[in-house]
Amino acid sequence: MIWNSKTLSIALGIEISNSVNCNEVQFNSKDVKKGDLFIALQGNRDGHDYIQDAIDKGATAVIVSKQVEINDKDKIILVNNSFEALQKMALYKRENSKAKFIAITGSVGKTSTKEALKILLQHDFIVFASRGNFNNYLGLLINLASMADDTEYAIFELGMNHQGEISELVQILKPNIAMINNISEAHLEFFHSLEEIAEAKCEIFKNFSKNDIAIINASNNCYNKILSILKNLSITNIYSFGHSSKASAKLILYKTLGEQVHLQYYINNKFIDITIPFIPRHFANNYTGVLLIIDILGKDIEISAKYLADIALTKGRGKIINIQNSRVICDYYNASPQSMKAALEYLKQVPADNKTSIIGEMLELGWNSQRLHEELVPYILDAGCTKVYLVGAYTKYIYDLLPNKISKKFFKNVEELITHITDLFEYSELILIKGSRGVKLDKIVDYYQ
């Protein structure tokens, strides 16, 4: 159990007379499982309207901030403010935890890096990893409040699209190890330059103690900028990974072997060779930082590296699925210029006679949008696409630059594509689906499956 009457009473500073034993904390009644604690938050919707639904799904306790009329009154915990109660629960967990806390941020690859580190550590330790990509302030509170007391390693991804957001998160999280996975042109709608994004990401190192460890990508354009910020913060315990000769860790060999890939890593003066089921090169690059953390923690890196074979690509994040007669690379969870180029490189690597790209526009790029979309054209051509379907306003710039020898079509939205292209998966093809989440390219897969 994650919470009981005693620990909840201490965390909330109130007397709880009812017997309470709960697992995870949920604020969305749709996510409630048997044994969970439901907290009624007020936002665009009032969580108090969903209390009975949460109880019907198995919630053993419900935190509310106003009187409600339900049958299971013994499950109600009344507080002055539900959100403040959640904050108190999160702070209680952090202050009383003996776990080592690891925080990961970056423009792309946060979730896959976090999940990979979790898989490598959980063979020998009790590991908690924040759920999905729930990486904002509310997500941090819910995740911390759902962490078991016996956790040995806690891994959190931290997201942001404005200055000051990560600073607010680390004031609570206080990570012992913090990594910036990469800096790229994401969220440029809210920033004027990559340097500004780097400054915002470097907030992850605020509140560092003397022995805390910073891990950065030496391949970043902003590498020297980040080093300067770390120097100003008086942080000296720094490790790096990437392609740079300065890096403590790097991927030095990536060789495809049919359905497998052979990888060689250099990690802190050690060479690691592994052969695992095929993964795209950008995933292999991300795992460099993961292996570096494993080595810093003093774990057996050769044994841990073998567990990379246990990592499976997921739907929406690069997994290949079959629809009718086609193989489909489902990479529509999100998109930035860097991840879009990486996905097209992935498409290039996978052998197929006929290749099709369905490219959704990349959102939140601000005044750089036209240029960053146009820069994808050579990657599309290099991937060997015979058909290209473009979805969303800014992909019109790609359409205009693609040569006429390629079969190309532009659609204002995904619904228009689904309506007009009725034979999408009928032929034996390899199809990449990639775009920002807001374009909703997942509807294509849902419609045809």
UniProtKB/Swiss-Prot annotation:
Residues the entry annotates as binding ATP: G106, S107, V108, G109, K110, T111, S112
Biological process terms in GO annotation: cell division; cell wall organization; peptidoglycan biosynthetic process; regulation of cell shape
InterPro entries hit by this protein: Mur-like_cat_sf, Mur_ligase_C, Mur_ligase_C_dom_sf, Mur_ligase_cen, Mur_ligase_N, MurCDEF_CellWall_CoF430Synth, MurE/MurF_N, UDP-N-AcMur_synth
Pathway(s) of this molecule: Cell wall biogenesis; peptidoglycan biosynthesis
Residues annotated as signal peptide: none
GO molecular function (one): UDP-N-acetylmuramoylalanyl-D-glutamyl-2,6-diaminopimelate-D-alanyl-D-alanine ligase activity
GO cellular component, one term: cytoplasm
Highest rank taxon of the organism: Bacteria
Family assignment from sequence similarity: Belongs to the MurCDEF family. MurF subfamily.
Name this polypeptide is given: UDP-N-acetylmuramoyl-tripeptide--D-alanyl-D-alanine ligase
Organism: Rickettsia prowazekii (strain Madrid E)
Lineage per the UniProt record: Bacteria, Pseudomonadati, Pseudomonadota, Alphaproteobacteria, Rickettsiales
